[in-house]
C-alpha cells in the first residue's frame, strides 16, 4: 500500500479505505460470528456467507498485516473487532438493526471504551459487575 506511511504519520486511515472494506464484505466477516447476512447485502466474492469462518477472518487480518503497519491494522479492524462483536452478540435488536448495517457497510465506526478512574485493579475487580450487566441485557 503506497500511502501507509503517510497514514501512520497522520494517525488516521482514510474513511474511503474503511468504506471499501465494507463494500467488499470484509467488515461483515470480521466479527467472530456467523456472517450477518440479515444486516448487509455486501458479500466477499470468493466465499459464500454460509462457508465463512474464523479461518477467513485470519486470512484478511494476515493480508492487512502484510503492510507492516500496526496503525493500518488497528485503524481498520482493531476497534471494529473489539466493539462490533458485543453489539451484534449482546445488543438489543432495535440497536443492532439501527446501527449494524452502517457498521457493516463501512459508513460508521465503532469501538469499545473502558475507563479506569484509578488503575487496572479497579477494572479487574469490576468483572463480576460487567458479567452481571451482560447477563441482564440478554434476558
What is each model feature region?
Residues 1-77, 94-98, 102-105:
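Amphipathic, small/basic residue-rich leader segments at the start of a protein or domain
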Residues 60, 83-87, 113:
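Adenylate-forming
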Residues 71-81, 107-116:
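Core alpha/beta catalytic barrel or barrel-like domain that forms the active/cofactor pocket
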Residues 90-139:
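Glycine-rich, Trp-frequent "lid" loop and neighboring beta-strands that shape
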Amino acid at each position: 500500500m503506497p500511502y501507509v506511511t503517510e497514514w501512520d504519520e497522520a494517525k488516521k486511515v482514510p474513511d474511503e479505505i474503511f468504506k471499501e472494506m465494507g463494500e467488499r464484505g470484509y467488515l461483515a466477516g470480521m466479527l467472530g460470528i456467523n456472517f450477518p447476512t440479515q444486516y448487509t447485502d455486501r458479500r466477499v466474492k470468493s466465499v459464500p456467507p454460509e462457508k465463512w469462518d474464523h479461518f477467513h477472518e485470519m486470512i484478511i487480518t494476515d493480508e492487512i498485516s502484510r503492510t507492516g503497519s500496526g496503525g493500518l491494522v488497528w485503524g481498520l479492524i482493531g476497534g471494529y473487532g473489539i466493539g462490533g462483536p458485543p453489539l451484534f452478540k449482546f445488543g438489543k435488536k432495535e440497536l443492532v438493526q439501527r446501527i449494524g448495517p452502517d457498521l457493516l457497510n463501512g459508513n460508521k465506526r465503532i469501538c469499545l471504551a473502558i475507563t479506569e478512574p484509578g488503575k487496572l485493579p479497579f477494572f479487574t475487580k469490576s468483572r463480576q459487575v460487567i458479567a452481571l450487566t451482560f447477563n441482564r441485557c440478554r434476558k
